[in-house]
C-alpha cells in the first residue's frame, strides 16, 4: 500500500465539522417516539438509552468529553457536563461498594415523555443503578455543550480528582 494521497487530510478536515454536527443532533430517543412508553432491560449500553431518553443530544456526544465522560476519569472536571460524569462515576463507585456490578447488572426502566422512570426493581442494586443513570441523564439534559472539551486530551487532566460526596 502506497502513501496516502495529499488530498485525504484536506478531505478529513472538511468532513470534521459535519461529523461534529452529527454528535450534537438529537439522539434517537428525542423525537415523537420517545413519548411512547418504552420498557428497557439494562446492559452497559442502556446507560446510553437513559441519556438519549432525556437529553437533547445523542449519547455519543459524551463518549470522549472532558476528563470524566467516557471510560475512567481523573482530574478537575472542566464544565457542567464533566461534573455530571464525575457524579455518575461516584454513583457507580458507591454502587460497587454496596456489592453491585454497574457495568453488567440489569434493571427495568421506562422512557415516558423524555423522563426515565425506574422499576420495578427486583433488588437494591437494580434500584441504585437505575437512579445513577437517571441522575446523569437529568443532569446532562440541563447542560450546555462545549465543543472544546470533545476529544479532550487526557494528559491535560490532573492526576487528582475531587472527592465524591
Swiss-Prot record:
One of its GO terms (cellular component) is extracellular region. Its main location: secreted. The active site is at residues 88, 133. Keywords: Calcium, Cleavage on pair of basic residues, Cytoplasmic vesicle, Disulfide bond, Glycoprotein, Hydrolase, Lipid metabolism, Lysosome, Metal-binding, Phospholipid metabolism, Secreted, Signal. It catalyses: a 1,2-diacyl-sn-glycero-3-phosphocholine + H2O = a 1-acyl-sn-glycero-3-phosphocholine + a fatty acid + H(+); 1-hexadecanoyl-2-(9Z-octadecenoyl)-sn-glycero-3-phosphocholine + H2O = 1-hexadecanoyl-sn-glycero-3-phosphocholine + (9Z)-octadecenoate + H(+); 1-octadecanoyl-2-(5Z,8Z,11Z,14Z-eicosatetraenoyl)-sn-glycero-3-phosphocholine + H2O = 1-octadecanoyl-sn-glycero-3-phosphocholine + (5Z,8Z,11Z,14Z)-eicosatetraenoate + H(+); 1,2-dihexadecanoyl-sn-glycero-3-phosphocholine + H2O = 1-hexadecanoyl-sn-glycero-3-phosphocholine + hexadecanoate + H(+). Secretory calcium-dependent phospholipase A2 that primarily targets extracellular phospholipids. Hydrolyzes the ester bond of the fatty acyl group attached at sn-2 position of phospholipids with preference for phosphatidylcholines and phosphatidylglycerols over phosphatidylethanolamines. Preferentially releases sn-2 omega-6 and omega-3 polyunsaturated fatty acyl (PUFA) chains over saturated fatty acyls. Contributes to phospholipid remodeling of very low-density lipoprotein (VLDL), low-density lipoprotein (LDL) and high-density lipoprotein (HDL) particles. This is Group 10 secretory phospholipase A2.
